[in-house]
Swiss-Prot record:
Region Disordered, annotated ranges: 32-70
Organism field: Cellvibrio japonicus (strain Ueda107) (Pseudomonas fluorescens subsp. cellulosa)
Pfam families given in the database record: 60KD_IMP, YidC_periplas
GO molecular function (one): membrane insertase activity
GO cellular component terms given for this protein: plasma membrane
Compositional bias annotation for Polar residues: 32-41, 60-70
InterPro entries documented for this protein: Membr_insert_YidC, Membr_insert_YidC_N, YidC/ALB3/OXA1/COX18, YidC/Oxa/ALB_C, YidC_ALB_C, YidC_periplasmic_sf
NCBIfam families membership: PRK01318.1-3, PRK01318.1-4, yidC_nterm, yidC_oxa1_cterm
GO biological process, one term: protein transport
Highest classification ranks of the organism: Bacteria, Pseudomonadati, Pseudomonadota, Gammaproteobacteria, Cellvibrionales
Designated name of the protein: Membrane protein insertase YidC
Location of the protein in the cell: Cell inner membrane
Keyword Cell inner membrane: yes
Alphabetically ordered keywords of this record: Cell inner membrane, Cell membrane, Chaperone, Membrane, Protein transport, Transmembrane, Transmembrane helix, Transport
Family as reported in the entry's similarity comment: Belongs to the OXA1/ALB3/YidC family. Type 1 subfamily.
Amino acid sequence: MDWQKNLLLAAIAAVILMLFIRWNHFQEQLPQHQAGNTPAGSSIAAIAPDSNGDIPSAVPTASDTPQATADSSKVELIQVKTDNLLVTINPLGGDIASVSLPRHFAKLNTPDEPFVLLDNRNNHTYVSQSGLIGTNGTDTAQGRPLFNSSSTSYELKEGSDGLVVDLTLQQGAVNITKRFSFKRGDYLIGVEYLIDNQAETPWSAQLYGQIKRDSQNFVKVSALEMNPYLGAAITTSEENYKKIHFEDIAKQTFETSRQGGWVAMVQHYFISAWIPDASSQVNYKLRKLGDQDLYLLGFTTQPVVVEPGSKGVIKASFYAGPKDTERLEEISPYLDLTVDYGWLWWIAKPLFAFLKFIHGFLGNWGLAIIGLTLSVKLLFFPLSAASYRSMAKMRKLQPKLLELKERYGEDRQKFSQEMMKLYKTEQVNPFGGCLPLLIQMPVFIALYWVLMESVELRHAPFFGWIEDLSRMDPYFVLPIIYGATMWIMQKLNPQPTDPMQARIMNMLPFVFTFMFLWFPAGLVLYWVTNNLLSIAQQYVITRQIERADSKA
C-alpha cells in the first residue's frame, strides 16, 4: 500500500506543481499605464503614416483623394461613448486610437477608472487601423485620408439601442463614408465603407483591417510570478485556433488565406479582434514592422468593384472587450477558443456553463463555486464512497501490517509478499483508495482553467475579506483552513508503516498550504469545500464500518 500511496502523492504533487506554475503564469497584475477615457485634445497621439510601411501593399494607387499634409498632432480626435465602450477615433485615416471598458475597472478599488484596452500614449502603441488600398484606395504609404465628421463627440442616448458615427470623404466624383456602428450592451463595432460612385469609370479598392501593437507587457510581476500570455491568435483552414507569439512573428512573417475567419490580439481576460465579412475571401498577414518593436496583425479582402452610377458596401467588424465565451461564439466560429481552457476544454466548458447556471440562482460567484463543488461531490459520491471504504479497511489492517513490519522489517521482499497475502485474505484492494481520487483529478484541473480564464470571476467578491475570487486570499485565511482540513483528512486515513514516509505525510499539509498561498481564492475555496465534504463523508463511512465490525 505504501508504494501505491507514494504514487498517488507523486501524481497529486505533480499536478499541484504544474498548476502552481500556471497560476504564476496567469496571475493578473495591474498595468502601470492605465488611464480612463481620453477627452478631445488630450495627449493621445494622432496616428500618422509610418515610414516603414504599416499600410498593406496592393496594386499601385490612382487615387486623387487629398492626402493629409497638416500636422497630425493637431487633429481633433472624435470621442464615442456607449454603455460598454469609450472609443477614440482619429479622423486621420479613421482609425480606432483607444478603447476603454467602463464596465471593467482598471483596479478593484477604482470603479471610476475604466480598464484601458487599446491605447496610444506613454511610449505604448496599441491601435486598430482600417482603410482602403488598391487601384482607387484612399490609404497609401505616402499618406492617410483626413475624414470629416459632423461632431467630435458622440454618445449613446437613453432609450436608444444603437449609435452610428459617420466619417465622410470626397474622392473626385466618388463619395466615401466610413461608418462605425455601435450597439447597446455590446463590444462589437461595425466598420463599413459606403461607396457612392458618381464617376464615369468603375471604382475599385480592397479593405484592410489590422491591429498594430508593440510587444510591451505592462504587467507587474514579482519573483514568484510569470507574465500572462500576450500575443496573436488566428483561425486558419488547418487549425481552428492558433497562437502566434511575437518572437515567432519577428522571425518569420505569417500568411494564410481563407473565407471569413478572424485575427486577434489576446491577453488575460480581454481580446481585440478583426472579423471580416464571413462570405469574403480574405488574406491574413502577421508581420513585424521593420526594426521597430511594432507588430501588425491584419487582413486584406479581394478587390471590390463599384460600377459608375452605383453604390457599394465593404464591411467588417472589430471586437474590443472581455473574453465572453457566449458572445464570442456568436460573433464568429472558434473565436470563443481565445478563452483558453487547455487540453481539458471538453470538461471545462460544461463546468463553466453549470457554474454560470448556479450563479444565476445564487447571485454570488463564491456561493456558485460552493454549489458546483457540492454537485461534483454528489456526482463522484459512489467513487468517493468506495475509496473511503477501502481506506477504512486499510486502517483496520494497520495493527497487522505493523506486526508484519516488525517480523520482516529487514527482508523487504518477504514483507511485501506477506502484505499482499494479507490483502488477499482480508479482501482488501490496495488500489481502492487511490484510483477513485486519480479519476477526479481531471475535473480539478479543468476547474482550475475555468477560474483562471473566466472574466466573470475577475473582481468578483465572495464575503468579508475576499473581494476578488480570481486573486490570492490577501490574508491567507482560506489556505490555512485548507491545510487544517488536509491534516484532519490524513488522520482519518491509514498511516504509512515506514517512519520516513509518515514524516513526509505529516509535512504535506504545510507544503500544500504554502503553495496555495498564491492560488486564486476561488480555487482554494473549491478545495476547502471539497475537503470539508470529504471529511464528513469519510467520517460517516468509517464509523459505519467500525460499528458493523463491533456488532459482528
